Amino acid sequence: YLVARFTPAFGAVGPWRGLVIGLGAASTVFGGLRALRQTDLKLVLAHGTISQLGFMFVLFGLGTPYAVTAGCVLLLAHAAFKASLFMSVGAWPVFAGVSVVSAASMAGIPLTLGFIAKEAGYEALVESGSARGALVLAVVVGASMLTFAYSTRFVLGTLFGVHDAAPQERADELARPARGFLAAPLVLATFTLVAGVAPFLLDPLVGAASSSLEPGTSVHLKVWHGVNPALLL
């Protein structure tokens, strides 16, 4: 939030922009590599958060209108899928579907809000048209491959893990969660899918956030932008 707020004022001052973008790019790779090394599911999510925040640093540090929009969408997508994953991770089989949907958004699978955010972020970096932007884009794409890898590992470890010999027996020993607790991750996962299929519904919300950071920013989120470099990446 502070980076997003301060970049319009400090973006042209000294090394601010380069420092923020460089720190963000390094964090995307560091967080992704650390997430792949974890054996605790919550630690996978925690280190994955470092990677996602690094991507946000890159976008808000870049500071162009489209990058700011992409950063706001990524912030919203990350809040939805990561909150859902943290609430659903555990032994209860009822959370399996929620975990798969939320992990798909984390990985940037099409028809999820995570995909909309990731494509917008790529497009913002492509449009920057600079050598630095191309280098950062290459780093972010590499980090996104790590994100896909640890998201897949999360799902496979949750559904098909071999270290837990009797997950159902362990689940039976736990107190059943309250209905409200069951509903919260389900609502967030549903939001991820609905926003991924109809992202234009978020235009007023994302537009208001983007305009507060970069006045005059116009937001028109779509599922299909045609075949372009961002989609191919």
Identify the residue ranges that each predicted region occupies:
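Hydrophobic transmembrane alpha-helices and their helix-loop junctions in integral membrane proteins
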Residues: Y1-E173, V197
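Cytoplasmic/organellar membrane-interface segments at the starts of transmembrane helices
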Residues: R153-L233
